[in-house]
UniProtKB/Swiss-Prot annotation:
It is found in: Cytoplasm. InterPro entries: Exonuc_VII_S, Exonuc_VII_ssu_sf. This is Exodeoxyribonuclease 7 small subunit. It comes from Clostridium botulinum (strain Okra / Type B1). Belongs to the XseB family. Heterooligomer composed of large and small subunits.
Amino acid sequence: MGRKKESFENMLEKLETIVDSMDNGEITLEDSMKSYEEGIKLCNKLYKVLKDAEGKIKILEDNKEEDFENS
């Protein structure tokens, strides 16, 4: 069975939780390293989602301009 794709908002919330836990300084160095690694992975996923959305918006904007010019 395939894993359900996580939403942008859920990934962002997880990242915020990781940052908060690291900021409070109450976790061990080992846990901090694990959290940092997970945070980097989440950042990369979030960046990809944003870049994909940016690409889709660019395509829509380009199509909008073409439609306007052809009118």
